[in-house]
Amino acid sequence: MSQNTPSLRELEHHSAFVERHIGPNDAEIAQMLGVIGHASLDAMTDAIVPAKIKSPAPLALPESITEVQALAKIRAIADKNTVLRSFIGQGYYGTHTPNVILRNILENPAWYTAYTPYQAEISQGRMEALINFQTLCADLTGMEIANASLLDEATAAAEAMTLAKRSAKSKSDTFFVHDAVHPQTLELLRTRAEPMGIVLRVGTPAEALEADSFGLLLQYPDTFGQVGDYKALVDAVHARGGLVAVATDLLALTLLAAPGEWGADIVVGNSQRFGVPFGFGGPHAAFMACRDAYKRSMPGRLIGVSIDAQGNPAYRLTLQTREQHIRREKATSNICTAQVLLAVMASMYAVYHGPEGLTRIARRTHRLASILAAALRKAGVQVGGDFFDTLHVTGVHAEEIHAKARAAGYNLRAIDSDSVGISLDETTTRADIVAVASVFGASLDVDALDASTADALPAGLLRQSEFLTHPVFNTHHSEHELLRYLRSLADKDLAMDRTMIPLGSCTMKLNATAEMIPVTWPEFSQIHPLVPADQALGYKELIDSLEAMLVECTGYDAVSLQPNSGAQGEYAGLLAIRAYHRSRGEDHRDICLIPDSAHGTNPASAQMCGMKVVVTKTDANGNVDVEDIRLNAEKYSDRLAAIMMTYPSTHGVFEEEVVEICEIIHKHGGQVYTDGANMNALVGVAKPGKWGSDVSHLNLHKTFCIPHGGGGPGVGPCAVKEHLAPFLPGKLGDHGPVGMVSAASFGSASILPISWMYIAMMGTEGLRKATQVAQLNANYIAKRLAPHFKTLYTGRNGLVAHECILDVRPLEKTSGIGAEDVAKRLIDFGFHAPTLSFPVAGTLMVEPTESESLHELDRFIDAMIQIREEITAIEDGRLDREDNPLKNAPHTATAVTASEWTHAYPRELAAFPLPSLKLQKYWPPVARVDNVYGDKNVMCACIPVDAYKDDEVEA
């Protein structure tokens, strides 16, 4: 072979995906390194990362493989799962995902690559979809307001418990729980209640009548299918100053009286059966709806209606001062990431079917259940009454029934030795009920029983009220109409399919198509979370493999994949620390040190674990103040439980003293929690578990490529050292020292293939290179923008980690232009803004990630330089201080094409500040949204159609 002939191994090109994932090619990397003054990526990394923490050896992971190879490997894993028809219920039900929704939302990067809608003007499409979701939930539950999703039904029930505690007049510490709630809900309530000093009492509705409690949780219909009349009980709880929360089923509420109509104060549930597959437990969009009086205490994000600068209706995140990143240690919930993508799917399922279609599905499901119940009773089998879709069958040999059912291709619910549950759903057919009946030795003539069998719902609890009367739920019922509606919404937004999203602390990197493909395979999507273990062997292999990958990347010893958001991972880590101290007889350790530069969820999570937060200082360079930590560690030595720190810091720097900080905390008996939000600066370079940290949460929706989905889903694994491993979250049915933190034992399991695929395709060298290029891209931006915007904090050698904070505050003094004006002006250039005023007010935090090409980085830099020139023009008097393109940004097509233009600058500067924008231009659908108006006039449901009508034209 001649020297110029490549080897077969080179031609096989196993690292092809690495080159697809990383934006700049090697020649561009060399060019960028020249700009920042380093000869190689390794030399740059040596200059950025403290020597004390650098990993001495490469990651012990396989080499990179191609997309084709990775898909073949994960196909072999998926094939080890066994897909039966699951009639297990317990909060999870079969559903048909309409193909138009599957292809155009779940599989569409315009929807799944978007970020949380903090920038309202470029998020109008998904916020309209979320308003639809809120309207759906509020209408069906009979409540006045609903939020834009929560993580799962059990978490939502726990949030309802704490909302009731905050809001009830009763001073009791007892929360009464219906003994027929779903088991996973009860498990999670136990986890949440104990650290907060809440006493749980579990019992029957009759016992609840006499109980002194601040709140009551009912399940309606209950976990065994029973539909009860709770009006008298609700009145009794209210008379004692308590609040009533109800966990419910949205499909059932198309037929049953809404909880709000019989007195409920808070209603929670899961929208999963509105078109979202089982997915072995998630992700699914839960919800909370409540009385208007409690809206300012409600957890989760809330979409509201405001007006824009032209007075037109516009959506925005409303009442944001409720949220954990603002309230910090005063927060009562740490909800951050929720389940926006799944909420959008559920809302569009309702839009597509409309109220009549939903009612038809519910009636069909109930009719099939009624016919099956009649057949079983006719054969002498005992079946409970007053049900919607779930039959509680008693007096049978359960083990024998389950064996026969599985042989016939069905899973039924395991309850105890002499009873089983059967939950029917949208997917159930005539053939299914015939087959299930035969398992019990019953035969049936479907049509004959249909004609002779009455419905099984109590007449006094049938729904009389209308729901989903807004035109959006009564218009888009043909596929063409829904397809075009979805396209119109997507076109209003900026997602990663159109532009870089340089949000600091958010890691908006490529979500590769190959990574996404396995998510919708039936072998992953159609597995109920409670199937027998031998039907989920593929999931076990996937989970074990991914946990081992994450252990290697982090240097910890064990990982739990149960937490279904970063905030839940934080909570799990702190629960592990708390349980560890208690296991050693040190229950008194309750102080958590948190630097003031920490992630906003940190103090909220600590508070939820019953810890008291002590905030420590940062120095003038943005570093954690080691001496202040030392002083506080000594001051609270006997009570010190933990420190929570983000590394690299939220200020975008690698702090030199991280090892010393760990030693200080350990000396005083505490544990070190390292927030993994910025792990994208560490993978393959340094491992927190090796420099003294005891626990971290990771964000698979940041570092490991699960898409953000417009505000969820996410996965927040909790990684720990060996001594904390016994205190990771328990699984359903376990009785260990720590309970569940999510409804499903493995959280949002169906999206785990995404991260597995990413790690497999990148390999050990690719993962390290991704980290290095993420650092390079951030430093390239900081260096090129240095003559125009100061980078607020830098680390050793004047370099940043993987993100940089641009300081706009000095310019506000000279020009009147603030960070928000810059953020809004970037929209005119087709960019999503960087993170605004976090972690430092008046700044912009930029994180480009490794996936952005040199072309895209330069496009962003050119936009920022042009904005700086406009600010200079204001400073020089060439542009008016009040009437300028920054103060009036963003500019809509309607505004710049209006017959009258009254501004003191030309239309072309407003619309096309750079020539390149004439070739490709994003037009925001609304002008700047009025935040103050939105918070003063809270409206969180679909906008009435007449609000969009133009004023009548005078004749």
Curated annotation (Swiss-Prot):
Record organism: Stenotrophomonas maltophilia (strain R551-3)
Subunit relationships: The glycine cleavage system is composed of four proteins: P, T, L and H.
GO-annotated molecular function: glycine binding; glycine dehydrogenase (decarboxylating) activity; pyridoxal phosphate binding
Protein family (similarity comment): Belongs to the GcvP family.
Pfam families listed in its UniProt record: GcvP2_C, GDC-P
EC number, as in UniProt: 1.4.4.2
Swiss-Prot/TrEMBL GO biological process terms: glycine decarboxylation via glycine cleavage system
N6-(pyridoxal phosphate)lysine: residues carrying this PTM: K702
UniProt GO cellular component terms: cytosol; glycine cleavage complex
Keywords annotated in UniProt: Oxidoreductase, Pyridoxal phosphate
HAMAP family: GcvP (MF_00711)
Designated name of the protein: Glycine dehydrogenase (decarboxylating)
Ligase recorded as keyword: no
Enzyme class: oxidoreductase
The reaction(s) this protein catalyses: N(6)-[(R)-lipoyl]-L-lysyl-[glycine-cleavage complex H protein] + glycine + H(+) = N(6)-[(R)-S(8)-aminomethyldihydrolipoyl]-L-lysyl-[glycine-cleavage complex H protein] + CO2
Purpose of the protein: The glycine cleavage system catalyzes the degradation of glycine. The P protein binds the alpha-amino group of glycine through its pyridoxal phosphate cofactor; CO(2) is released and the remaining methylamine moiety is then transferred to the lipoamide cofactor of the H protein.
CDD domains for the chain: GDC-P
The keyword Oxidoreductase is assigned to this record: yes
